[in-house]
């Protein structure tokens, strides 16, 4: 009898854990933390503060998860009406708004205290501003106010490399802002691709994404132009001496792939082209930052 009781309890605990993990958008947070690691690694520190860096990643991750959970909370009504999001924890009834509010607040507070006390105040406040930028400025206002929502608010999601840099140095640096700029320029074509794929969803809930307000063809052209701009921006770390030929070759190859998908999206009538572009953009950013990391450490290894 005790085993029969224990099994449902264990299953229930796993479901609760899975529900709250989904609220934090773990795949998105993981990608953000990878870019933060790159920021930490490229920062010019003589004696790398490993423990401080570890606490930095935990704190940044907790606050990013908090922002994601707040996004779920604020968007729960429109999520319930969209095909892409109606199975999220709140619309599906797996949890309730009060629990999510408590959970997201707790994550944010713990993350902030951790960063402030064990890393440095600058990183704590910069991460807090990023949280506000995404959870409040973007989700509560810009998303519903302008088709340039993701362009303006993209800075919030682009901050992790800078946060990683400040976590180990305690200061802002122009090179860190270059890494931010890469993600900032990458963000619009990434989101506009999924917006094209889900344009009817956004139209149904009156969210003024670019393909809703300006049309799909205009959005396709914008994606292509942004990928060209991204290619140019990605060269800047080489020009300022941050990284070398390994990154340059990788960057040109990856951006050629992104431009190919954007060009194909512009010219192709295929229905799945937008989703293919969206998926490629994720692999593109991941590979780009891995290339930054590889170039940096290969340079250290082979430098006499």
From Swiss-Prot:
Q: What is the topology of this protein in the membrane according to its UniProt annotation?
A: Multi-pass membrane protein
The record's keywords, sorted A to Z, are: Cell inner membrane, Cell membrane, Heme biosynthesis, Membrane, Transferase, Transmembrane, Transmembrane helix
Q: Does the keyword Endoplasmic reticulum apply?
A: no
Q: Name one GO molecular function term.
A: protoheme IX farnesyltransferase activity
Q: What are the EC numbers?
A: 2.5.1.141
Catalytic activity reads: heme b + (2E,6E)-farnesyl diphosphate + H2O = Fe(II)-heme o + diphosphate
* Primary localization class, coarse: membrane
Q: Give the main EC class.
A: transferase
NCBIfam families of this UniProt entry? cyoE_ctaB (TIGR01473), PRK04375.1-2 (NF003349)
Remarks, anything else? Carbon 2 of the heme B porphyrin ring is defined according to the Fischer nomenclature.
UniProt protein name: Protoheme IX farnesyltransferase 2
Organism from which the protein derives: Vibrio campbellii (strain ATCC BAA-1116)
